[in-house]
Amino acid sequence: MAAPVDLELKKAFAELQAKMVDTQQKVKLADLQIEQLSRVKKHANLTHGEITSLPESTRMFEGAGRMFILQSKGEISNQLLEKQKTADDKIKELEQKKTYLERSVKDAEDNIREMLMSRRAQ
């Protein structure tokens, strides 16, 4: 009778360990992506701040591969604001994903603890 219980617990622990390793990797990846997006947002914010102090008649060029494209100050400003907004949205999405992953691991741990307690009670 004890052998099936032990096998069941071993299987549950193995699944939890695999899930935790996978989740920890995903959380680290999400942290790296959040960090990178924060740098992109900060760069766009600083660039936008510098551009706003320039007069409207200033010629501005956007880098596109090996060439530069002449654009108006308004277009570049709009692109930078859009880049900031996109980075903000992605950061929020990654934070939610990270929270979900951490919660799912905690739930799995709680389930195994509950299983252990019920086995000990028997």
From Swiss-Prot:
Entry-linked InterPro entries: PFD_beta-like, Prefoldin
A GO molecular function held by the record: unfolded protein binding
Any single GO CC term annotated in Swiss-Prot or TrEMBL for this entry: prefoldin complex
Keyword Chaperone: yes
Biological process annotations from GO: protein folding
Keywords, sorted A to Z: Chaperone
Gene3D superfamilies: 1.10.287.370
Role summary: Binds specifically to cytosolic chaperonin (c-CPN) and transfers target proteins to it. Binds to nascent polypeptide chain and promotes folding in an environment in which there are many competing pathways for nonnative proteins.
Quaternary structure, from the entry: Heterohexamer of two PFD-alpha type and four PFD-beta type subunits.
Family recorded in the similarity comment: Belongs to the prefoldin subunit beta family.
Record's protein name: Prefoldin subunit 1
Organism expressing this protein natively: Danio rerio (Zebrafish)
Source taxonomy: Eukaryota, Metazoa, Chordata, Craniata, Vertebrata
Gene: pfdn1
